[in-house]
Amino acid sequence: MNQLIVATGNAHKVEEFDGLLETSGFEVCSAKVCGGMPYVLEDGDTFGANARIKALALRALAPKDAWIVSDDSGLEVDALGGAPGIHSARYAGEGASDLHNLNKLLLELEEQPASQRAARFRCVLCLIDPSGREQFFDGACEGRIAKAPEGAAGFGYDPVFVPEGHSESFAELGESIKSKLSHRALAILAMRRCLES
């Protein structure tokens, strides 16, 4: 069975990959099999570039016959020219909390009507096979930014992101619905289709 190592220290992310790649012929492992995820400076200017940086950093430590996958993701708001984008986790500055990032976003959109609040969560995966070939897979969940936070579940921008076709935020919809709409899940499923073809 092929080994697929997920370049992250986040156990929940590894579980998401494992669940969606079940029966794919890949054994999904965390970066722990390589001694842990090394520190990397994510200084790329796109989600794909940052995903590639992480994948290459782990590949240097991984067994030569392993497949490596990494992701980078964030929120893109059309009225803000795609921001916060690759800066989603630190939108209000280095070390900013989720609440600070969310409040900065709402402040910047304060004057925007509902029709101008289109947004999406985007995820880009970088997959490196044992030969070193790189492939990228994109997943996006379209929606809009609400005027105020709603719901207590989730994290980050979940309380203000209302996915297309729904009237409740990700934080109100709950994990089971969110996981079906997830930008990461869509990217993983695109990768799985490629691996199985």
Where would I find each of the regions flagged by the language model?
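Anionic-ligand binding patches
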Residues: 2-5, 11-197
